[in-house]
Curated annotation (Swiss-Prot):
It comes from the Bacteria. It comes from Pseudomonas fluorescens (strain SBW25). This is Adenylosuccinate synthetase. It is found in: Cytoplasm. The gene is purA. Pathway: Purine metabolism; AMP biosynthesis via de novo pathway; AMP from IMP: step 1/2. The keyword Magnesium applies.
């Protein structure tokens, strides 16, 4: 029988999921996206060549791997088609292997306009969204007024529903936010073009996944963003609009939790965050600048600089519990090379010195991290392929993190290329 493996982020996103998905797809018949949209930015480096993917699953660069976009993903047709074109220009036969669930909600121009108008209106209180229409598209889905990919197949009905949606959202755009109205005819013309291009890619993804499962094929489920951005379990309201935790796999693909065999949590050896929201271990000194520079910490989707800080074992333990993590992949260990000492957050205290376990953004206010200091290392870890090649202090750091989080570190990434990896236990084994 084949195995179903989930790869997801355990922090605030940007943990290095794309590289690991690409590495593990050597064993997979299919890779599935199950939540989020083109707000994701998954960077792959193969033989020194960098590719950034936003909507298309990271298995696309592996010959013969089927790439599926499940019903939980919100699809911006213009962004998807641009991504397909870029890959085809590199010689990747995307349309042969990419299939999209007709149940995926569509992101259209008014969703983007609303997203950006809201962030503009919030001013300094903005959440820090990518401004790509993700949240408004999920809102339409939950309110049962949204248009889906499959609606493009019935254009007369689509036109009626689109007119209602444009009128509905223009009421807010013009009347409340004082922004320009979205043109119905222009939007309709764009959608007619999308319909012709997307029709050959539509497939009942849930049925396909169960066919693959029954045939004994290995399947990988690729998460976007990170567990602490989950709409339910993240640092609300500074979160994304989908379930980034393992529960989102079942709802976003139609494959139930009993069929998930291994959940791999991708975890940076330090911590980063993009945009607003609590970040207890954030560094504002030269160490923070070192992490940002060595880790090239700029968002693959937005280009925004990421906030950097020490590794936080408290938030990791929460992510491990919420996701039922089987094993951890520790990424960007090489970024810590050259640091004399390294801090690990092992708890938080409030103003009165009490131990606190925060559950939402407000409960982080005024908390101070409690650190355990461990020795760093001066030797390079870049490109190490066995545990024995790592400096003794790097191995000790990994062991200490394992003990603090209560989960095994099964994979260690020592560089951006797919071959710069130490695999201690393979998820598909």
């Amino acid at each position: 029988m084949g195995k179903n493996v989930v790869v997801l982020g355990t922090q605030w996103g940007d943990e290095g999921k794309g590289k690991i998905v690409d590495l593990l797809t050597e064993h997979a018949a299919a890779v599935v996206r199950y939540q989020g949209g083109h707000n994701a930015g998954h960077t792959l480096v193969i033989d020194g060549e960098k590719t950034v993917l936003h909507l298309i699953p990271s298995g696309v660069l592996r010959e013969g791997v089927q790439c599926l976009i499940g019903n939980g993903v919100v699809v911006a047709p213009d962004a998807l088609l641009r991504e397909i074109t870029k890959l085809e220009e590199k010689g990747v036969p995307v349309r042969e292997r990419l299939r999209i669930s007709p149940s995926c909600p569509l992101i259209l121009s008014f969703h983007v306009a609303l997203d950006q108008a809201r962030e503009k209106a919030r001013g300094e209180l903005k959440i820090g969204t990518t401004g790509r229409g993700i949240g408004p598209a999920y809102e339409d889905k939950v309110a049962r007024r949204g248009l889906r990919v499959g609606d493009l197949l019935n254009m007369p009905r689509f036109e009626d529903k689109l007119r209602e949606l444009v009128d509905y959202h223009n009421f807010m755009l013009v009347g409340y936010y004082k922004e320009p109205a979205i043109e119905f005819e222009k939007t309709l013309a764009e959608c007619k073009e999308y319909a012709e291009l997307l029709k050959p890619l539509m497939l009942d993804v849930t049925a396909e996944l169960h066919d693959l499962r029954r045939a004994g094929k290995d399947i990988m489920f690729e998460g976007a963003q990170g567990s602490l951005l989950d709409i339910d379990h993240g640092t609300y309201p500074y979160v994304t609009s989908s379930n980034t935790t393992a529960g989102g796999v079942a709802t976003g693909s139609g494959v139930g939790p009993m069929f998930l065999d291994y959940i791999l949590g991708i975890t940076k050896a330090y911590t980063t965050r993009v945009g607003s929201g609590p970040f207890p271990t954030e560094l504002f000194d030269e160490v923070g600048a070192h992490l940002a520079k060595q880790g090239h910490e700029f968002g693959a989707t937005t280009g925004r600089a990421r906030r950097c800080g020490w590794f936080d074992a408290v938030i990791l333990r929460r992510a491990i519990d919420v996701n039922s993590i089987s094993g951890i992949c520790f990424t960007k260990l090489d970024v810590l090379d050259g640091l004399e000492t390294i801090n690990i957050c092992v708890g938080y205290k409030d103003a009165d010195g009490n131990d606190v376990a925060p559950t939402d953004a407000d409960s982080y206010v005024g908390l101070q991290p409690v650190y355990e200091e461990v020795p760093g290392w001066t030797e390079s870890t870049v490109g190490a392929k066995t545990l024995e090649e790592l400096p003794a202090n790097a191995r000790a750091y990994i062991k200490r993190v394992e003990a603090l989080i209560g989960a095994p570190i099964d994979i260690i990434s020592t560089g951006p290329d797919r071959n710069e990896t130490i695999v201690l236990r393979h998820p598909f084994a």
